């Protein structure tokens, strides 16, 4: 059997990080088992689904690098209405579905009664049964189509995350599978799609647990093989509450990109939300695919920790090739009006500075002063700069100007003799020198920084 999983987002807004985590686990499960990972766009909500939102999903999947095997044949539910109608007709013909002519007023009365009695909402008055007389068909009501849910027994499955789950069928409604206008409903479309796509494992959020028995019963009615189900725990915010944009939480995957998070780091972090492989925190996607098993997914909710995300991002920045980092940093430098990054070469700059920043925006800040001197912070000026420091910088510039070989080692060899002559410690030279050349007191080794910036530019900045 070829394992087939799917990710099935609705294009009604941004691509949520919870959705990306679901896609990641589905993708990793398929890749681990040498199977297929498929994408389906559930766009039957015509009022809310937009082409822009579809593009947001596709762009988000591309950004994080979750490649799907049906890229040339993505399934769109709105293109499958004829297929849904065909299956509904089959269910009606075989007696697994029926027309319901209840008015809105009747349904509202049933709903109120059900809330009081704790029973299923619909009283099945239009459900055909042996010896039962159905009401007279009203002339002013367009019928919906309802599925005939079994009245006895239980619907159960062994959830790949939550374990054994059993739901009494008497607790289930005869759900609507086609609205009065003929459009199919969510739970029905999902079943037909999973069946036609050959999905073997449905991995999704645990907010879908209640949909599962309904979908299993429909699958049985169409004589389909049942997929296995795994329901993933919710992701909570740092306060332990449901993630919400309204609460100020970052929820859209594209927002994390704007924050300077690498896609590899984002996936690494999301993988650790609810899944664990020993104490491993930092790993590649190749390792994740090798290690991933749904039995290692906790059924308990996970909590966001932005500090941990940034730490993981910093670790990924360290191992990212400088050429790739340069392409990511250049647009951020361009926003600061830095368009020429040849002198010094940006890749050389990144090699020097990339061990400290934990996001690409901060990394760009670290590169900035190699091309343009920053305006020093007032606190740094107060602490490290005065008239004597200014005079000392001019004297040290003369030593620098006398160097024939301009490299970090030659520059470093000037420090101790100069400090001895001046009767100062290295801090009295190094910190003002950083301010004079870079405009900041926080840089990597100052000799390496000066070597990269170049002799002419260093002398120009000191003497400015």
Swiss-Prot record:
GO terms for molecular function: ATP binding; glutamate-tRNA ligase activity; tRNA binding; zinc ion binding. It catalyses: tRNA(Glu) + L-glutamate + ATP = L-glutamyl-tRNA(Glu) + AMP + diphosphate. Its EC number is 6.1.1.17. One of its GO terms (biological process) is glutamyl-tRNA aminoacylation. Keywords: Aminoacyl-tRNA synthetase, ATP-binding, Cytoplasm, Ligase, Nucleotide-binding, Protein biosynthesis. One of its GO terms (cellular component) is cytosol. Gene3D superfamilies: 1.10.10.350, HUPs. Monomer. This is Glutamate--tRNA ligase. It comes from Neisseria meningitidis serogroup B (strain ATCC BAA-335 / MC58). The lineage of its organism: Bacteria, Pseudomonadati, Pseudomonadota, Betaproteobacteria, Neisseriales.
């Amino acid at each position: 059997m070829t394992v087939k999983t799917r990710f099935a987002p609705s294009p009604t807004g941004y691509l949520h990080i919870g959705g990306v985590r679901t896609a990641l686990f589905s993708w990793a499960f398929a890749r681990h088992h040498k199977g297929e990972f498929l994408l389906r766009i559930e766009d039957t909500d015509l009022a809310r689904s937009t082409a822009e939102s579809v593009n947001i999903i596709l762009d988000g999947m591309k950004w994080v690098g979750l490649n799907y095997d049906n890229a040339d044949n993505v399934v769109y539910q709105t293109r499958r209405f004829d297929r849904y109608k065909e299956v509904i007709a089959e269910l009606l013909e075989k007696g697994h579905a029926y027309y319901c002519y209840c008015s809105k007023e009747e349904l509202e009365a049933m709903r109120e009664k059900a809330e009081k009695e704790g029973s299923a909402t619909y009283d099945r008055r239009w459900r055909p049964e042996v010896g039962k007389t159905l009401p007279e068909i009203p002339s002013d009501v367009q019928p919906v189509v309802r599925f005939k849910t079994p009245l006895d027994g239980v619907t159960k499955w062994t959830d790949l995350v939550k374990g054994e789950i059993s739901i009494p069928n008497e607790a289930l409604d005869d759900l609507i599978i086609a609205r009065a206008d003929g459009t199919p409903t969510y739970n029905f479309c999902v079943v037909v799609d999973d069946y036609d796509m050959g999905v073997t494992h449905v991995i999704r959020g645990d907010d879908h647990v209640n949909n599962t028995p309904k979908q299993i019963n429909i699958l049985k009615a169409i004589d389909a093989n049942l997929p296995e189900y795994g329901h993933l725990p919710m992701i909570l915010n740092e306060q332990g509450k449901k993630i919400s944009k309204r609460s100020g939480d970052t929820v859209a995957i594209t927002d994390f990109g704007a924050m300077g998070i690498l896609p590899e780091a984002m996936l690494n972090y999301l993988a650790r939300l609810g899944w664990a492989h020993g104490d491993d925190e930092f790993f590649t996607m190749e390792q994740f695919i090798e290690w991933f098993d749904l039995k290692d997914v906790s059924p308990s909710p996970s909590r966001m920790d932005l500090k941990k995300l940034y730490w993981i991002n910093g670790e990924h920045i360290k191992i990212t090739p400088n050429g790739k980092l340069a392409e990511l940093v250049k647009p951020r430098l361009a926003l600061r009006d830095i368009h020429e990054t040849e002198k010094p070469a940006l890749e050389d700059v990144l090699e020097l500075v990339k061990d400290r920043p934990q996001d690409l925006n901060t990394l760009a800040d670290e590169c900035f002063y190699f091309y343009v001197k920053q305006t020093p912070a007032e606190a740094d000026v107060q602490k490290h700069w005065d008239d004597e420091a200014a005079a000392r910088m001019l004297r040290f510039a003369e030593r620098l100007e006398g160097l024939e070989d301009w490299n970090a080692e030659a520059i470093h060899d000037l420090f101790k003799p100069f400090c001895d002559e001046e009767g100062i410690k290295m801090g009295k030279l190094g910190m003002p020198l950083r301010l004079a050349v870079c405009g900041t007191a926080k840089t990597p080794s100052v000799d390496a920084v000066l070597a990269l910036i170049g002799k002419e530019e260093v002398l120009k900045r000191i003497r400015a």
